[in-house]
Amino acid sequence: MRTELSSNIRIKHDKKIQKLLNRFPRDFLVKLCVEWIQKQTYPPNAKDINLEDMLDDEEWNPEAFYKNVPKSMLKRSIIHRMLVYDWPNGFYLGQIAQLEILALAHGFVSMRWTASKVHHSAEKTVLPNPLVFLELLKSELESIFVYHTYISRHETLPITFIRLVLWDSKRPTALHTYPSSKQIFYLGLMDDSDVLLHNIFLRNDVCHSLFLQCLSRLLYRLKAGSALRPIDLVSKNLTTFCTNVGVNKEANALGAWQIYAKNLVDRSPLDTRPILSDDNSSLIADSTQNCEKHREMAIQRRFGDTHSQVLDKLLITLDHDYIEKSTEKDKVLEENVESYNPTEQRPLVVMQLRGQHILEGLKDICRQDALDPFTMPSYLTGETGLSILYVRDGLVLQRQESLGQQEIN
């Protein structure tokens, strides 16, 4: 049996396919049907069954129907026609792959994307051409899985999508049924970049573990010593990744350096000591007096353009030693206490923010004078370009471990 499946294999209709079709706008579906029929990429398969009991031969003309769909016809009626009359034997495997990629690219279906960076100790390693990458990946998958691949280019962003469906090569059952979500992998290769976008890998899943091994071997074949390391960024918005980690990434808040130069930000969040800068009194006065002009300037400098940084979840772990050894008297007292353990005096505080657009929400809160844009730490303004952060004594630390499973609720 061939390990790579053809795109012309038919998948039986079920509720998942109908649910996927319902995500699309009416006109978008009609346009797709016309394209499938005219280009004969996924032609109607109703000819394989007897249609005499359902439609007359004159009535069954899919191309003429989809070119002139009555305006009064509802989307559900069009979907019914697709499933019952034109593709009654099931959609093709490539047809479903195209639908899923289009739904993700146009935002009809949302999915949490994350990213990993190709790390090499000696030099930067850029991912190869997507077609070359796919062929190398196929060679790694052949001995382990029965698989299907689909590659497509995003219409506006510099991203090439690769969709993979994996089955166990020893037990390739249910090839004609809609695959489980655990069997489907989405990859996104950005142009001239060393960052790989992908869906979130699940912990303790054999299929996901084997797929990660295939990716690791592929990178080693490209350049010995290369490995994937996770980037702590999770978002449903692909533009966010192009802005933060792509080759066209933007310096989102360059004006913030005017504030950093005053030493007003990135201090410990629990530090109660006064700011000792001599020339920052005017900025603090403007902040406390709610000076709208200076506040708005600070907000724009700190947040930049948040429209290209859409985050729906922000997870921050704060690690801080609240015992300050500022005086000799304090040091003597602490040395005399035998039970004192510095590691026990570091509380971990996990802060999680959720919403449709977190950064825009924080920006509005600053405008309402509920937060101070002058002293707000950088991990709350999007300047770090991350959505999962570990902050130790006010400093954002990045993970250095190799790629592993990342299951995020």
Swiss-Prot record:
Main location: nucleus
Places the protein is found: Nucleus; Chromosome
Pfam families: CENP-N
Keywords: Cell cycle, Cell division, Chromosome, Mitosis, Nucleus
GO biological process, one term: chromosome segregation
Cellular component aspect of the GO annotation: condensed chromosome, centromeric region; kinetochore; Mis6-Sim4 complex; nucleus
Self-association state and partner proteins as the record states: Component of the inner kinetochore constitutive centromere-associated network (CCAN) (also known as central kinetochore Sim4 complex in fission yeast), which is composed of at least cnl2, cnp3, cnp20, fta1, fta2, fta3, fta4, fta6, fta7, mal2, mhf1, mhf2, mis6, mis15, mis17, sim4 and wip1. Interacts with mis6 and mis17.
Similarity comment: Belongs to the CENP-N/CHL4 family.
Role: Component of the kinetochore, a multiprotein complex that assembles on centromeric DNA and attaches chromosomes to spindle microtubules, mediating chromosome segregation and sister chromatid segregation during meiosis and mitosis. Component of the inner kinetochore constitutive centromere-associated network (CCAN), which serves as a structural platform for outer kinetochore assembly. Has a role in the formation and/or maintenance of specialized chromatin at the centromere.
Protein name: Inner kinetochore subunit mis15
Organism whose genome encodes this protein: Schizosaccharomyces pombe (strain 972 / ATCC 24843) (Fission yeast)
Gene name, Swiss-Prot/TrEMBL: mis15
